[in-house]
Amino acid sequence: MAEHGAHITTASVVDDQPSIFEVVAQDSLMSAVRPALQHVVKVLAESNPAHFGFFWRWFDEIFTLLDLLLQQHYLSKTSASFSENFYGLKRIVMGDQHKLQRLANAGLPKQQFMKSIMFLVLLPYLKVKLEKLVSSLREEDEYSIHPPSSRWKRFYRAFLAAYPFVNMAWEGWFLVQQLRYILGKAQHHSPLLRLAGVRLGRLTVQDIQALEHKPAEASMMQLPAGSIGEKIKSALKKAVGGVALSLSTGLSVGVFFLQFLEWWYSSENQETIKSLTALPTPPPPVHLDYNSDSPLLPKMKTVCPLCRKNRVNDTVLATSGYVFCYRCVFHYVRSHQACPITGYPTEVQHLIKLYSPEN
């Protein structure tokens, strides 16, 4: 009875097909790495904007570049992405007969390799940028930055109205595919795998042995390059491989650390939280008025530090506590991603409008 239930749970179409729990776990792995790294970079940028502000402003591009190196390394060396290899899975080209399947260390054919790179690296980057664009447009629409009769405003309002339905259809497509995978009606838990022309399978004993012996064989079979171009190409390959290997090692350690943190915080009980929140409130910082005579600050407290006029639509920056006109600080933060006075990294969502009794 238990065996029958296990077979229903895995819903295997083929013998090496992983269970839904394995494929969902590997999907959630990289989606947890991005926000974790983003939080680390944000903390560093807030503590030292001069040195780490660049990494915060260009986080998406830097992360995508590192992700490209990492996924390229794993797809060419193990026929799997980093998260798939972490859970002992590999990508199998659709249409291959079971007897003719390639070992994992052979890598993917060029067509499937390029499609996999596109769906693993490029598509998530575009999705993140689209979500940020939608968030920015909603901010502008909420505070009416553009004139009501603007053609551009009518266009992006229509875009904002349609986006939730498009996003719901996209997520529903993935949900339906996962349900079909659970019921054994599909070999792919994700539509992107089908578009890439591959499916996921477990690593076999032969795959593991080939992956373990490949580094030793590669080091023994290295031949001296003939021309200068070949030497440069070989050096670049070694450099990229070294960076990818360092990233994979660091990510493996980081993943275990993230899992430890999840366990640590999930094990906290309510008594511990209450004891921490019951501690007395610390005194205010003594350095808040240190820069009160800064030339950037006007002497009149009702004057905006940017336009040097009486403030209109008072807005405070959550990152620094200074108050500006909404329009002034909105355009400044959107252009510079920093507080005009302190230089702290700041985003549009850090703007808080104030409503005084006089208004």
From Swiss-Prot:
Q: Where in the cell is it found?
A: Peroxisome membrane
Residues exposed to the Cytoplasmic side:
48-51, 140-144, 278-359
Q: Where are the transmembrane segments?
A: 20-47, 52-76, 110-139, 145-183, 250-277
The cross-references to InterPro entries, in alphabetical order and at most eight, read:
PEX12 (IPR017375), Pex_N (IPR006845), Znf_RING/FYVE/PHD (IPR013083)
Tell me which CDD domains the record gives: mRING_PEX12
Its GO CC terms are:
peroxisomal importomer complex; peroxisomal membrane
User: Which parts of the sequence bind Zn(2+)?
Assistant: 304, 307, 325, 328
Q: How does the protein associate with the membrane?
A: Multi-pass membrane protein
Domain of life (superkingdom): Eukaryota
**One Pfam family cited in the UniProt record for this chain:** Pex2_Pex12
- Keywords per UniProt: Membrane, Metal-binding, Peroxisome, Protein transport, Transmembrane, Transmembrane helix, Transport, Ubl conjugation pathway, Zinc, Zinc-finger
Q: Which GO terms describe its molecular function?
A: ubiquitin ligase activator activity; ubiquitin-protein transferase activity; zinc ion binding
Look up the record and give one Gene Ontology term from the biological process aspect. Answer: protein polyubiquitination
What pathway does the UniProt record associate with this protein? Protein modification; protein ubiquitination
Start and end residues, zinc fingers (RING-type): 304-343
Question: What family is reported?
Answer: Belongs to the pex2/pex10/pex12 family.
Q: What does this protein do?
A: Component of a retrotranslocation channel required for peroxisome organization by mediating export of the PEX5 receptor from peroxisomes to the cytosol, thereby promoting PEX5 recycling. The retrotranslocation channel is composed of PEX2, PEX10 and PEX12; each subunit contributing transmembrane segments that coassemble into an open channel that specifically allows the passage of PEX5 through the peroxisomal membrane. PEX12 also regulates PEX5 recycling by activating the E3 ubiquitin-protein ligase activity of PEX10.
Note the subunit structure.
Answer: Component of the PEX2-PEX10-PEX12 retrotranslocation channel, composed of PEX2, PEX10 and PEX12. Interacts with PEX19 via its cytoplasmic domain.
Record remark on domains: The three subunits of the retrotranslocation channel (PEX2, PEX10 and PEX12) coassemble in the membrane into a channel with an open 10 Angstrom pore. The RING-type zinc-fingers that catalyze PEX5 receptor ubiquitination are positioned above the pore on the cytosolic side of the complex. The RING-type zinc-finger is degenerated and only coordinates one zinc ions, preventing E3 ubiquitin-protein ligase activity.
Report the protein name in the record: Peroxisome assembly protein 12
Q: Which organism encodes this protein?
A: Bos taurus (Bovine)
The UniProt gene name for this protein comes to PEX12
